[in-house]
C-alpha cells in the first residue's frame, strides 16, 4: 500500500553518529556555554546568594539577588581584590545597594550593603539616627499592614521604620530599645579601626568620607558588620549594584524547602 520514498540518484545516505562523536558534540556545547557564561558573570551580570540578615527587611536570608556589574564600569573577568577595571563610567551613589569585597577578607568574601555616604560626605549616627552633612534622616514608623507586605510578618510588629534622606527612602530595622551596643570584637577587645572608645553602633562619628571611598551599612542596623567596624571601602572594590531580588527560598530542617513566592522579582528600594 505504501511505497518507500526513493532516494535521489547519487545521494549518499548519512552515516550514523558514533557514541564518541555524540559525546564530543556535547563537550563542545558545554565548552561554548562555559566560554560565554564566565565572562558574562565576571563582567556583566551575576547573582548573589544572601546568607545573613544584615540587610533585613530589604533583603532576607534565602534571597538570590541580581547584580548589575555594568553599573559603574566594565571589569576584567575573574579578578577579585584588587578589582581590575577596563574602564569606569560611574561611581556608587547614596542609597545604592551594592556588592563589595570585605576589607577584612578581600580575597573571597563578598558583602551586600547599602551606601549611606560617599566621598566628601560627613556622616554621623545620633541615637541610631543617620545624619549626613548635618541633615538628619526622617524616620516614620510603619504600620502593621505595611510591615506584613515587606516581610510577611516574620519579624514582629513595629520594629521597622521608613528611613528617608535627600536621596533615598527605604525600610530599616531599628534596635528594639535605645541601649547602646559597644563595638566589640570577640573576646571583648575594642575595634581599633576608629580608635574612639566612646563610639557605639548607634552613636558614631562624625567622620568625613575620603574621595574615592564609600561608607556602607546594613539596613538591619543592630546586627550588621559594616563600615562602623571595618572602615571605608574603596569605590573600585564595589563589584556592582543590585536592583532586584530574583527569587527566594530556604532549605529548612527535614529537609524542607520553603519557597518565598512573594519575594520573586521584587525591586530593591
Residue ranges of each PLM-predicted region?
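Soluble "head" domains of membrane/secretory-pathway proteins
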Residues: 2-22, 46-49, 57-269
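Aromatic-capped interface at the extracytoplasmic side
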Residues: 39-53
Amino acid at each position: 500500500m505504501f511505497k518507500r520514498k526513493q532516494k535521489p540518484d547519487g545521494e549518499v545516505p548519512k552515516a550514523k553518529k558514533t557514541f564518541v562523536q555524540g559525546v564530543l558534540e556535547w563537550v563542545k556545547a558545554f565548552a561554548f556555554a562555559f566560554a560565554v557564561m564566565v565572562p558574562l558573570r565576571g563582567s556583566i551580570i551575576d547573582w548573589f546568594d544572601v546568607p545573613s540578615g544584615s540587610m533585613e527587611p530589604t533583603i532576607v536570608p534565602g534571597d538570590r539577588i541580581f547584580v548589575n556589574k555594568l553599573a559603574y564600569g566594565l571589569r576584567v573577568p575573574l579578578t577579585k581584590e584588587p578589582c581590575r577595571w577596563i574602564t569606569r563610567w560611574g561611581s556608587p551613589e547614596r542609597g545604592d545597594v551594592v556588592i563589595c569585597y570585605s576589607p577584612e577578607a578581600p580575597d573571597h568574601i563578598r558583602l551586600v550593603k547599602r551606601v549611606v555616604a560617599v566621598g566628601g560626605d560627613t556622616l554621623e549616627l545620633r541615637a541610631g539616627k543617620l545624619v549626613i552633612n548635618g541633615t538628619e534622616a526622617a524616620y516614620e514608623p510603619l504600620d502593621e499592614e505595611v510591615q506584613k507586605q515587606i516581610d510577611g510578618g516574620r519579624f514582629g510588629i513595629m520594629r521597622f521604620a521608613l528611613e528617608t534622606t535627600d536621596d533615598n527612602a527605604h525600610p530599616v530595622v531599628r534596635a528594639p530599645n535605645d541601649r547602646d551596643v559597644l563595638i566589640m570584637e570577640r573576646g571583648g577587645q575594642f575595634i581599633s579601626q576608629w580608635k574612639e572608645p566612646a563610639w557605639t553602633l548607634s552613636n558614631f562619628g562624625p567622620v568625613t568620607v575620603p574621595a574615592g571611598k564609600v561608607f556602607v551599612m546594613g539596613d538591619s542596623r543592630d546586627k550588621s558588620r559594616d563600615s562602623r567596624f571595618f572602615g571605608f571601602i574603596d569605590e573600585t572594590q564595589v563589584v556592582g549594584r543590585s536592583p532586584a531580588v530574583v527569587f527566594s527560598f530556604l532549605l529548612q530542617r527535614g529537609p524542607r524547602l520553603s519557597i518565598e513566592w512573594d519575594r520573586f522579582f521584587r525591586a530593591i528600594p
